[in-house]
UniProtKB/Swiss-Prot annotation:
Name the record gives this protein: Imidazole glycerol phosphate synthase subunit HisF
Gene coding for it: hisF
Originating organism: Salmonella paratyphi C (strain RKS4594)
GO process terms (BP): L-histidine biosynthetic process
Active site (catalytic residues): D11, D130
Superkingdom of the organism of origin: Bacteria
Amino acid sequence: MLAKRIIPCLDVRDGQVVKGVQFRNHEIIGDIVPLAKRYADEGADELVFYDITASSDGRVVDKSWVARVAEVIDIPFCVAGGIRSIDDAAKILSFGADKISINSPALADPTLITRLADRFGVQCIVVGIDTWFDDATGKYHVNQYTGNENRTRVTQWETLDWVQEVQQRGAGEIALNMMNQDGVRNGYDLTQLKKVRDVCRVPLIASGGAGTMEHFLEAFRDADVDGALAASVFHKQIINIGELKAYLAGQGVEIRIC
């Protein structure tokens, strides 16, 4: 059995790490490189960096900080933000990233997933899915351009349909960003995670809602996710990664101990 992964998420805007609630009202957390090093030293299995306004601004993630991060950490990291072409991805990978993640550009051009997977291998390609539960319809819908609240829009895709579509096109991993839960720290949306797990054959990463160590345990135990991504509980030092891993190991979760 592969070890479950603990993955701090660093949302990047204007060269700094920020954090919002339900993808809104972002506050500045700190500088990118020191935070990355701190999480690596604490025992994170992987880091994810989202340049949250790159897609909505029509640009690619700033590659300069990617190289600086690669110099100071020795764990895998994934970078997302406005990647629209093989050339964009190649440059980010050449600067030291281990994976690239695409979200809004994949919705605009689903063939991008296949082209990237064919060029770099599925193990490098993560598809991020920003999913929102609509109380009125009782359905989960995929949103696009969520880094800019003035441009965010609901797409034609229901979440489960898009999960299946991206797998068919070559996604090697799926990061499910549950917008309703983002930043509120009241637990992952286990109902949605279980539904996605039923149709997801590739590694599945849960994102949005972690507030306690028990929330991580529930995601691993009840929804069988492969990794749990979180931001505010780590940024605000509510949970220490080493202590979290010790707790999970004590609960029988297969995890890499620091």
